Amino acid sequence: MPTINQLVRKGREKKVVKSKSPALNKGYNSFKKIQTNVSSPQKRGVCTRVGTMTPKKPNSALRKYARVRLTNGIEVTAYIPGIGHNLQEHSVVLIRGGRVKDLPGVRYHIIRGALDTAGVANRMQGRSKYGAKKPKESKK
């Protein structure tokens, strides 16, 4: 425990909060060709690689991911949620923050149903998270 005198002389240091999705905190001014510190909730990017990855120890699966080059020039790894996808190289996608706990280095999610990404087919519950449209009512 510091004394009052020590606190008067030195003071408390502020804790630096590190962002969990740093690529969304950088912008790019293409006219001036400089990086800017403009945060955004989502960013657009182009897929450079689409593939599968195996998760960390207790889990076992083939998780779908895409390597995405964002409009600010940063390349990130993003998870493709849902069953089945239509992404391939050069697909334009929208990413949001949010890590995948069992995939190391994956800090972003691709938003389904936006830009080139199709929504999940035949999804009835939690549709908004997967870009699925409301199913048509069958006439009797």
Swiss-Prot record:
InterPro entries: NA-bd_OB-fold (IPR012340), Ribosomal_uS12 (IPR006032), Ribosomal_uS12_bac (IPR005679). The keyword Nucleotide-binding does not apply. Keywords: Methylation, Ribonucleoprotein, Ribosomal protein, RNA-binding, rRNA-binding, tRNA-binding. GO terms for molecular function: rRNA binding; structural constituent of ribosome; tRNA binding. PROSITE patterns: RIBOSOMAL_S12. GO terms for biological process: translation. The keyword rRNA-binding applies. The modification 3-methylthioaspartic acid is found at residue 102. GO terms for cellular component: small ribosomal subunit. Part of the 30S ribosomal subunit. Contacts proteins S8 and S17. May interact with IF1 in the 30S initiation complex. Belongs to the universal ribosomal protein uS12 family. With S4 and S5 plays an important role in translational accuracy. Interacts with and stabilizes bases of the 16S rRNA that are involved in tRNA selection in the A site and with the mRNA backbone. Located at the interface of the 30S and 50S subunits, it traverses the body of the 30S subunit contacting proteins on the other side and probably holding the rRNA structure together. The combined cluster of proteins S8, S12 and S17 appears to hold together the shoulder and platform of the 30S subunit. This is Small ribosomal subunit protein uS12. It comes from Geobacillus sp. (strain WCH70). The gene is rpsL.
